[in-house]
Amino acid sequence: MQIAVPDQANGMTDVMDTAERNKAIGRRWFAAFNAHDLEALLALYAEDAEHFSPKLKVRMPATEGWVRGVPALRAWWRDAFDRLPTLHYEVVKLTADTEQVFMEYIRHVEDEADLRVGEVLEVRDGRIIASRVYHG
């Protein structure tokens, strides 16, 4: 006896596979960031990716918190890694769906108070097209 498997089953597998691939992007993002490996971090992003952070608003007010494109991301993170050599993130939660990665982490920097952060990565075709950071 054969049992017919609805096409939806394949669709569900595709959804799960995409979510797992996106979660893997999140894991690679943390590994690259914590290693201060700028090129590995940037390789995860699309060339025209956008990034929002309240820290950008403070450090570079003219940006209104946004940088766009890999060259701008490179400059932003190079500055952060140079200024804050002890900067690293402790993962609290990492989850993903087919379009986004949701990350919660604790930002640690020597001589600064720890900061709990939420970040969303939007992913398309295996690359981050946008990232948004949220914290108090």
Feature locations, PLM:
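C-terminal and inter-domain tail/linker signature
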Residues: 2-136
